[in-house]
Amino acid sequence: MAAKSARKGPTKAKKNLLDSLGVESVDYKDTATLRVFISDRGKIRSRGVTGLTVQQQRQVAQAIKNAREMALLPYPGQDRQRRAALCP
């Protein structure tokens, strides 16, 4: 007996978060907007999740990296390092 292939329905288009927020240009100093594109673990969310275009995803990723360098946003895994330093 042949197994039936699982068919998936049509995929739902993701809404572009930058357009819905009304942001025209991405700035590393706008941490409130950049936090939307960071997971709870501090990682940059993918295009599939955010619905951004390729160019917008590159701009957001670069802005997040710049904000991390300026200590405006945390690096991923930074909380674990802090907890380890606090607990002897």
UniProtKB/Swiss-Prot annotation:
SUPFAM superfamilies xref list: Ribosomal protein S18
Q: Which InterPro entries match?
A: Ribosomal_bS18, Ribosomal_bS18_CS, Ribosomal_bS18_sf
GO molecular function per UniProt = small ribosomal subunit rRNA binding; structural constituent of ribosome
Gene Ontology, cellular component aspect: cytosolic small ribosomal subunit; peptidoglycan-based cell wall; plasma membrane
Recorded hits in PROSITE patterns, A to Z, give: RIBOSOMAL_S18
One GO biological process this protein is involved in is: translation
Q: Which UniProt keywords apply?
A: Ribonucleoprotein, Ribosomal protein, RNA-binding, rRNA-binding
Record Gene3D superfamilies: Ribosomal protein S18
Summary of subunit composition and partner proteins: Part of the 30S ribosomal subunit. Forms a tight heterodimer with protein bS6.
Q: Which family does it belong to?
A: Belongs to the bacterial ribosomal protein bS18 family.
Q: NCBIfam families attached here?
A: S18
What job does the chain carry out? Binds as a heterodimer with protein bS6 to the central domain of the 16S rRNA, where it helps stabilize the platform of the 30S subunit.
What is the protein's given name? Small ribosomal subunit protein bS18B
The protein's organism comes out as Mycobacterium tuberculosis (strain ATCC 25618 / H37Rv)
From the broadest rank down, the organism's phylogenetic lineage runs:
Bacteria, Bacillati, Actinomycetota, Actinomycetes, Mycobacteriales
